[in-house]
């Protein structure tokens, strides 16, 4: 009870004097030597305490006290507090977290706060989660400015923090997120350095998710402990967006969708990368070159005649997915086949139809790439259209992939299925064990 009393006085400071008088009166009436738990108090006293809390509703408080007394309340490990409704589900989280002596560990808490609140009210809600060893917290603030709840700086159980549609003007120098491993920022705005400021709060940060950089500034992502990075920075409407500078040597997993220029530094620990960019990265020589260590690469990008420096090798690359919507896809594929000697699986896919034709007819290399003659086993071609450039490329692969085991093709134009697939089956193929599959 001492902890509860301290919590109420601290997080609802305006009612401190009233709480003190109530607790003193309770102890005199009950003639108790030590304070009891809140759940051991009379219903009318519990109701009076609840009446001083933020978000109080008389009918819901009465109903909850009755249900709790009958043993009908069961804690929800995934709590949602939505101030648009403030129904029994919302208030059960508040009242139950205060009443229960050993409330169940909270797997997640989702706060949807549309109205304006002072910082202490938000801190009150978050502290309820902290007291229940909260693992994940999501705050949707609907465009308002958020002062980070100070109680988070002492929370050692929080693993995932999601901030959605809010503004952060400043982060106190003393503030920390000691146990947060995953930080997700969705439509968050703030000062010029708000992203680096938030990143620095996480001492064990392993995963970062950023959905739209609305600050129009270059965001430097430089986190020694970061293992996974996901960025969705595609323009939606006319909202101006900024760009990123990715400098994370320890990064193992990268997922990025970007319509703006991104600067890539070396990522020697990379295992899997999924990259979709809508601008030509040819001026950034470190773009594809920074991905040379990856084993799984999915790439959709406009390219130039020289997509990366000569001599670049993708020795670890085993699985490659390449988009065929850009004018330079044949040139990029030819280069990567030549520079990925251990490639075993190749998938070609048309993400979005383009009216732009390849810049020029692909010139077959004089020397067969090592991966075709010794490694490639799986070929998948999604949304195959049967253009001259596609037929030219697939014909070359089938004629030189000695160990190809399966070639799978699909097309969106069902009227042309039979003719296209018949044409593919008639092509020369060097592998005697290759199986053709048409979906």
Swiss-Prot record:
Q: Which InterPro entries match?
A: FBD, FBL13/AtMIF1-like, LRR_dom_sf
Do you know which Pfam families this protein is assigned to?
FBD (PF08387)
Protein origin, superkingdom: Eukaryota
The stretches annotated as LRR repeats are 155-177, 223-246
F-box domain sequence ranges: 35-81
Record keywords, A-Z: Leucine-rich repeat, Repeat
FBD domain boundaries: 361-411
SUPFAM superfamilies (UniProt xref): L domain-like
Supply the PANTHER family for this chain.
F-BOX DOMAIN-CONTAINING PROTEIN, F-BOX/RNI SUPERFAMILY PROTEIN-RELATED
Official protein name in the record: F-box/FBD/LRR-repeat protein At5g56570
């Amino acid at each position: 009870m001492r902890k509860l009393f301290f919590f109420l006085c601290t997080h609802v400071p305006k009612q401190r004097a009233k709480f003190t008088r109530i607790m003193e009166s309770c102890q005199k009436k009950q003639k108790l030597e030590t304070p009891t738990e809140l759940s051991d108090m009379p219903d009318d006293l519990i109701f009076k305490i609840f009446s001083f809390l933020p978000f109080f509703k008389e009918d819901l408080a009465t109903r909850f006290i009755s249900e709790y007394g009958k043993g009908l309340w069961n804690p929800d490990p995934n709590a949602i507090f939505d101030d648009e409704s403030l129904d029994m589900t919302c208030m059960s989280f508040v009242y139950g977290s205060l009443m229960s002596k050993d409330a169940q560990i909270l797997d997640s808490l989702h706060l949807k706060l549309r109205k304006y609140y002072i910082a202490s009210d938000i801190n009150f809600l978050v502290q309820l989660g902290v007291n229940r060893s909260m693992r994940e917290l999501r705050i949707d603030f609907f465009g308002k400015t958020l002062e980070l709840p100070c109680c988070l700086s002492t929370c050692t159980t929080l693993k995932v923090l999601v901030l959605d549609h809010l503004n952060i003007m400043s982060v106190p120098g003393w503030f920390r997120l000691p146990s947060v491993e995953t930080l997700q920022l969705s439509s968050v705005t703030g000062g010029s350095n708000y992203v680096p400021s938030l990143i620095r709060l996480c001492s064990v940060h392993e995963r970062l998710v950023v959905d739209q950089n609305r600050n129009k500034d270059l965001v430097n992502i430089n986190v020694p402990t970061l293992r996974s990075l996901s960025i969705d920075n595609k323009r939606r409407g006319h909202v101006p967006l900024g760009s990123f500078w990715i400098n994370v040597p320890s990064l193992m997993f990268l997922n990025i969708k970007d319509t703006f220029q991104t600067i890539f530094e070396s990522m020697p620990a990379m295992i899997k990368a999924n990259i979709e960019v809508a601008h030509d990265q040819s001026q950034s020589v470190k773009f594809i070159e920074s991905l040379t260590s990856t084993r799984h690469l999915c790439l959709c990008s406009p390219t130039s005649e020289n997509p990366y420096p000569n001599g670049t090798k993708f020795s670890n690359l085993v699985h490659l997915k390449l988009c065929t919507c850009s004018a330079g896809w044949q040139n990029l594929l030819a280069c990567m086949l030549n520079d990925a000697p251990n490639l075993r699986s190749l998938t070609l896919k048309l993400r979005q139809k383009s009216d732009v034709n390849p810049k020029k007819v692909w010139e077959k290399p004089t020397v067969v790439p090592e991966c075709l003659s010794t490694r490639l086993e799986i070929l998948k071609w999604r949304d195959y259209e049967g253009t001259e450039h596609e037929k030219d490329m697939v014909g070359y692969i089938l004629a030189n992939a000695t160990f190809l085991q399966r070639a799978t093709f699909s097309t969106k134009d069902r009227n042309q299925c039979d003719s296209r697939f018949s044409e593919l089956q008639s092509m020369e193929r060097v592998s005697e064990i290759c199986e053709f599959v048409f979906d």
